[in-house]
Amino acid sequence: MNTDDYSNTENSVDASHQPRVNLSYVNEAIQTETVVRRSLLYRLTQIFRLGQMHALSGLKALIAAMFVLAYPAMVIAGHKLNDSAVEFGDARHWSAPEIGVASTLIARELDGPGWISDKHEWHPQARLTALPAWQESLLSALSDHGQLLLDLLADERDPDLITAVRLLDASATHKTTDRLLAANEAFARYDDRVAGGVTRAPTGEDALIARLITSAQWAEREYSQLAAISTPGDGWLASSDSIEAVYKAKAVAHVTHAMLDAVADREQNMLAKLGVTETMSDALNAWETAARMRPLFIANHGTGSVTGTSHPAIMALHFDQSRLAVLKVAAQIEAARQERIATPSGPASVVVAQGTGKGT
C-alpha cells in the first residue's frame, strides 16, 4: 500500500466517523419566523389599508352629508331679490331718467345675484322659483317700456335706443348677460346723445298721458293673469304657479313705479301747472304698494280654507287700484288741457279789461 492509498483510506474513515447534523429544523424555524413576520406585516398593512378605506369612506360620507345639508342653505342664500327704490349714483347724471332707471335695474341684477337663466342646472340658484320669475318679468317690462319710448319718438327714433330695446328681447339667442351688458352700453350712448342735443327723450303732456294709459293697460293685463291664477277654490302653500305669478307681477309693478316716478320728478313743474301733483302722488303710492308686496310665503287658498289667503288675489287688487289711479291722473290732465283751451289766457284777459276800463 502506497502512501496515497493510505491517505485516501484515512480520509474516508474520518469522513465516515464525522457526526451528521440535521439542520432542517433550523431552516424550518427561520422560514416559520419569516412567514410569521411577513404575515404580521401583511395583517398590519391590511388593517392600515382597511382603516384608510374606512376613513376615506367616512370622509366621503361626511362631505356628502355636508353638501346635502349645505345645498338647501345655498339655495336660500341665493335668493337675493333687490326691490329697493332706484337711486342714481354720483358717477353719472342721466339726461333721460327713464334710461337711467333701466340701466340701473339691469346693473343691479348683473352685479347682485347674476342672471339665473345663465346658471348651470346644478347651480343652487337654478333651483329657485321667485328670482327667475322676477328677472324674466323685469326684462320683459323693461323691453315693453323701451318699445313705448320708441313709439313716442315715432320718426325720431334713435339707433342706439333701437339697439338697446332689441337686445332686451327675450327671444334673442345670445346669452342674457352678454345681451344686457351690450344693452346698457347702448342706453348710455343714447343718453349721451340726448345730453348733447343730438336726439331727444319723450317729454310733455302727450308723452305723459301715453305713459299713464299704457301703464293702465299693463295693470289690466297683470290683473287678468293674477285673477286666473287665484280663481281655484284651494291651492298649495307656496305653489310654484302662485310664486311665479306674484313675483312676475311684482317685477312689472317695480319697473312701472320706478319709470313713472322718474318722469314725475322730471315733469314736476308741468304736474304742478296742471294741478295733478297730488293725484300723481297717489298713483305712485298705488304702484309702490304692489311693488313692495313681499310675503314670507306665497299662499293661494280659497275662501273655504283655514286661512283664506290668496296672495295672487291680493296682488290683483293692487294692480286694479293702480290702474284706476293712473287713469284718474290722465283724466285730470286731459280735463285741465280742455279747460285751458276753452279759457282765454290770464294775461290777455287782463289787457282787455284794462283797455275797456272794466277790469275784473
Walk through the language-model features, giving the residues of each.
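N-terminal Sec/ER secretory leader and immediately downstream segment
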Residues: 83-182
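Extended amphipathic alpha-helical interaction segments
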Residues: 180-292
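N-terminal targeting leaders characterized by basic, low-complexity, disordered sequences
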Residues: 1-37
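Juxtamembrane low-complexity tails/linkers enriched in Ser/Thr-Pro and polybasic
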Residues: 40-53
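Short, well-ordered, aromatic-rich surface patches in folded extracellular/luminal domains
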Residues: 170-210, 309-333
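A cross-kingdom marker for long, charged
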Residues: 2, 89-90, 261-360
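Short, charged/polar, low-complexity loop and linker segments
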Residues: 115-127, 196-199, 228-241, 299-307
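Hydrophobic membrane-insertion alpha-helices, especially the h-region
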Residues: 59-75
